[in-house]
Swiss-Prot record:
It catalyses: 1,2-dihydroxy-5-(methylsulfanyl)pent-1-en-3-one + O2 = 3-(methylsulfanyl)propanoate + CO + formate + 2 H(+); 1,2-dihydroxy-5-(methylsulfanyl)pent-1-en-3-one + O2 = 4-methylsulfanyl-2-oxobutanoate + formate + 2 H(+). GO terms for molecular function: acireductone dioxygenase (Ni2+-requiring) activity; acireductone dioxygenase [iron(II)-requiring] activity; iron ion binding; nickel cation binding. The lineage of its organism: Bacteria, Bacillati, Cyanobacteriota, Cyanophyceae, Synechococcales. Its cofactor is Fe(2+); Ni(2+). Coiled coil: none annotated. This is Acireductone dioxygenase. Ni(2+) binds at residues 98, 100, 104, 142. The keyword Cytoplasm does not apply. Binds 1 Fe(2+) cation per monomer. Pathway: Amino-acid biosynthesis; L-methionine biosynthesis via salvage pathway; L-methionine from S-methyl-5-thio-alpha-D-ribose 1-phosphate: step 5/6.
Length: 181
């Protein structure tokens, strides 16, 4: 279930607002902050071990639309499972607050991940689940938690042919907010 929890940056133990699984409500709250959120319908039933090519083919219509709208030049599919040998190191890398010089655009084909967005003096923690699509504007301070036992498959859209390139802020704010188990 998709959940958006909003906190003041100085009160990580006290949520101000929580929206649960109402795509329209979540999209409206995020749009007020300049972010886009959509829920895409499942196109086909994909096997847990589906290849990146099969995943991209299953969502070809949506992928083409987003590439055209956003001018994205590359799209890939990434999967992480609990048995991935580098899961702990990858989790730590993404948990550090960072920004990008391009939009960070993700679609969750399966599983879940927690995007925490540091917007002004608030933190918007969005638990993305299957069929959720999010676009985080360039320059937005954020971090991502995949959990200690990650399970997700996501499409990633890029303007930069180098792919995921982060500029870390040096802030420890991510360590103050709830994480996935």
């Amino acid at each position: 279930m998709t959940v958006l929890t909003i906190y003041r940056e100085d009160l990580p133990e006290q949520p101000l607002t929580q929206a649960t699984d109402g795509a329209a409500e979540i999209a409206a709250l995020l749009a007020q902050q300049g972010l886009r959120f959509e829920r895409w319908p499942a196109q086909v039933e994909l096997a847990d071990d589906a290849t990146p090519e099969q995943i991209l083919a299953a969502y070809a219509t949506e992928v083409d639309r987003v590439k055209t709208e956003g001018g994205y030049i590359t799209v890939d599919a990434v999967s992480l499972r609990p048995d991935h040998p580098d899961r702990a190191a990858l989790r730590q890398k993404f948990l550090a607050e960072h920004i990008h010089s391009e939009d960070e655009v993700r679609f969750f084909v399966a599983g879940q991940g927690l995007f925490s967005l540091h917007l002004g003096d608030h933190v918007y923690a969005l638990l993305c689940t299957q069929n959720d699509w999010i676009s985080v504007p360039a320059g937005t301070r954020h971090w991502f938690d995949m959990g200690s036992q990650p399970y997700f498959t996501a499409l990633r859209f890029f303007n930069n042919p180098e792919g995921w390139v982060a500029q870390f802020t040096g802030s420890d704010i991510a360590s103050q907010f709830p994480l996935l188990p």
